[in-house]
Amino acid sequence: MIVLVAAGWTIWEHNRDPIAVLDKKPGTIIPIVDSTLISRFLSEEREYRHIKLSTENIDTIEAFISLPLIRYTPIMPVIIVLGGLEIGIHNFRYITEPGNNAIVIYQYPYKTDQWRNNSTLSQIPIVRRKIFEVPAQVLSLSDWIHQQSWSDTSRINVSGYSFGSFFVPAVYHLDNLKEHRLAPGVIAYGGVDIYQLLMTNIKKPSLPLKMLTSWFVATALYPVEPALHLPQMNNEFLIINGTLDDQIPKESWQELHRLVQEPKTIIILEEGHMHPRKPELTLKLVNISKKWLREKKVINP
């Protein structure tokens, strides 16, 4: 009986329209936090803003924004950064020479410390709902940016790194179905096949338990499976992966490369996976991304 239920659930999830799951309307958006400070993370002082946008249907959208103090043009390009799970305002220190560009670091709607303070089992449905809200939150954040006096609305892009790279395909797929307003983007250290990625990264349980856990989570999160969205992205992308990556299997990132339509630029580094303990690699990835985005005239020098 359990096997039949599991099989039926798997078939149902795999036949659901992922867009119907992810295309959530935010409803009314109201700023509830907008604080500003002037600080120097690296070589120059910039204006930093912390914003929270209350929505009716997709929870609170939170982001940190870095703006130049001296603006050489009335409007500027915008990079929306989707980073790792521990992303926050401190990540601005990796973005050297940001130039006359606005950098927006998106904060995920589920904080990792909530895992430590709550029962894992009880949090699964909450995490699932939050993950499904991410693409709609990112596009709603983009809509809010469009309304800001400082944004060049023709040059707003999304750049995803590690954990964040897995949301980029769904974000651009949704954008493509709407008004196709996003500029060319970056997918760094991403891959496809959530099941295989979990099998690679879950270390502790026995093999049967690992397989069961990976199947359950991959099925529950199937609407955000990158392989569903990659062929539907109608844009240009920089794709970066590492040959020494022990978290993203080679077949996973090779399939990602295959599924992304042209035009695309693929860079393969002789590096492992990015991590907060490897700031040099993070800086390298940011600089590669900036160079490509400047060549494509997505951002200012």
For each feature predicted by the language model, list its residue ranges.
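N-terminal cap/lid segment of alpha/beta-hydrolase-fold proteins
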Residues: 27-72
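Cap/lid segment of the alpha/beta-hydrolase catalytic domain
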Residues: 87-97, 101-136, 197-200
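Short alpha-helix in the alpha/beta-hydrolase fold that links the catalytic acid
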Residues: 235, 249-258
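Histidine-bearing beta->alpha loop at or near hydrolase active sites
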Residues: 269-282
